[in-house]
């Protein structure tokens, strides 16, 4: 009896979650937690060009923090923001608390852009924001003519031959570019060239 009630409760909860995510019109419909655990409505970023990234501190792509901070310093005056969400799902490369992660990033890379609480971006516990982001822009593949892209493709295909048919986030430092009206414009894999990303940011920042 108790178990049946629990199952019904969980079913209703999941249904509510699905409806909320599917009914979202833009990223402004979502709330996240900042690095102090406070709720932050993404509606606070209306009118900004946003880059949303899932990060890690012990990844081969971690040096991208330097390039991201450079972009932030260059375009922040034009209404550009980076929203960083540490995630420990890929090789457990984002260990520690959000406070420890923040200290590492500010100390080593002088990161000034907002960093939010750690989240999951794939699976049963993924944050609704990422469910929405992936629904808007799925995975379009790695550039296998690029050495890093080829490596990622081979590594992930060994784990799952059909990995490229799923919209899941593939690795740390996947990025989503969001327009000033909250719509997801483009997805960048961690191996994509930062100069291409900057060109898109520059165009939106005019």
Language-model features and meaning:
Residues 10-21:
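Bacterial N-terminal signal peptides
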Residues 22-43:
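N-terminal "domain-start" segment that seeds a small globular fold
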Residues 2-11:
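Bacterial N-terminal signal peptides that target proteins for export
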Residues 79-96, 112-123:
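Thiol-based oxidoreductase modules, predominantly thioredoxin-like and allied folds used
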Residues 110-189:
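Thiol/selenol-based redox catalytic cores and closely related redox-interacting motifs
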Residues 48-49, 57-58, 62-86, 105-109:
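Conserved helix-turn-beta segment immediately C-terminal to the redox Cys motif
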Residues 186-205:
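Non-catalytic, surface beta->alpha helical segment in thiol-disulfide oxidoreductase systems
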């Amino acid at each position: 009896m108790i178990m049946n009630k629990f199952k019904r409760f969980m079913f209703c909860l999941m249904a509510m979650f699905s409806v909320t995510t599917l009914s979202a019109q833009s990223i402004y419909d979502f709330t996240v937690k900042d690095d102090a655990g406070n709720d932050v409505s993404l509606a606070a970023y209306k009118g900004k060009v946003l880059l949303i990234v899932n990060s890690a501190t012990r990844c081969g792509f971690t040096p991208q923090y330097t390039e991201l901070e450079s972009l932030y310093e260059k375009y922040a005056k034009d209404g550009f923001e980076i929203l960083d969400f540490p995630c420990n799902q890929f090789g457990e490369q984002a260990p520690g608390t959000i406070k420890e992660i923040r200290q590492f990033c500010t100390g080593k890379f002088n990161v000034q852009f907002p960093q939010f609480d750690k989240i999951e971006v794939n699976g049963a516990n993924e944050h609704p924001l990422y469910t929405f982001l992936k629904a808007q822009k799925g995975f379009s593949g790695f550039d296998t003519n690029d050495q890093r892209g080829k490596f990622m493709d081979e590594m992930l295909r060994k784990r799952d031959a059909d990995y490229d048919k799923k919209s899941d986030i593939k690795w740390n430092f996947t990025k989503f570019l969001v327009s000033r009206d909250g719509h997801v414009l483009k997805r960048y894999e961690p191996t994509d060239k930062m100069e291409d990303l900057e060109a898109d940011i520059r165009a939106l920042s005019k």
